[in-house]
Amino acid sequence: MVLPPILTRLVLVLSMAFAAHPLAAQTRPAPGGGEPPVVAPGVQIAALGEAMRIADVIAVMREEGLQYGSSLEAELFPDRGGPRWQAVVGLIYDADTMRKRFDAAFEAEVGRDPGAIAGMLDFFGSERGQRILQLEIEARRALLDESAEEAAKIKVEDMSARNDPRLDLLQEFAEANDLIELNVAGALNSNLAFYRGMAEGAAFDEALSEEQMLADVWSQEGDVRRETEEWLYPYLALAYGPLSDSDLRDYIAFSRTPEGRRLNGATFAAFDAVFSAISHDLGRAAAKQMQGEDI
């Protein structure tokens, strides 16, 4: 049984800018040349998560998840889910649980290099950084609408046909942040977690070994990569359309700094933890639904 690819749209960071936060000022030298106040790493990381507007990002991801739950029902057990399945999906995509999982993983990752946090906040704690963040969230929410997603895809096709140099910049941004590879890896991890959940729920006639599940998931790599690219560039074109080339180049430059790379890796790792857990729970719940059991 080959499951439909689960393209979990992990946050496209550095496609997570930060709003201005008082912590950015706290890390600068004190007036008169004195030492700046010491801020505990845990406090810094918590402030960074709030500055990144993770709650708003998770709210959009929850909406994406509810839509995906409906698609999963149509694929695996058409017209047999109903309100009960919708309620289960809503619990699995519980925003508070998602946030707790994100925070735990994010703190562990960023905590390895707390000295980088000030640089992250310095870059994004500006009017431009706030604007970038708002554009990213608005674009992600807009793409919940299929017509908006289709329009964004057509725009990218037109940019490609015209050899628009802006598309080159978007590709440079994606490469600087390794967005294709990290999203593909995250999606495959989520697919494997879904498989494991299905196996735990006894969805298969015969037990599958870990090797069999890994092989089946890896066979989806090409499809997942194609879907990632088909979603990523329309998203980037929509989100960064209002930005000047100069602003986008500065964003790319920051992405290549040690702080930018650290943040990128930490955010992907944190959302990978979130979506692996969600996918496992979805797989187990889907297996029980397919068998007509109480979830």
What positions do the PLM features span?
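Short acidic/histidine-centered micro-motifs embedded in hydrophobic/aromatic stretches
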Residues: 123, 135-136, 176, 254, ...
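Bacterial N-terminal signal peptides
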Residues: 9-19
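Extended amphipathic alpha-helical interaction segments
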Residues: 140-241
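Compositionally biased, proline/threonine/alanine/serine-rich low-complexity intrinsically disordered stretches
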Residues: 16, 23-48, 173, 213-215, ...
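Bacterial N-terminal signal peptides that target proteins for export
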Residues: 1-11
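Extracytoplasmic/secreted proteins, especially bacterial periplasmic and envelope-associated proteins
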Residues: 43, 47, 97, 101, ...
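A cross-kingdom marker for long, charged
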Residues: 214, 222-295
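N-terminal Sec/ER secretory leader and immediately downstream segment
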Residues: 27-146, 282
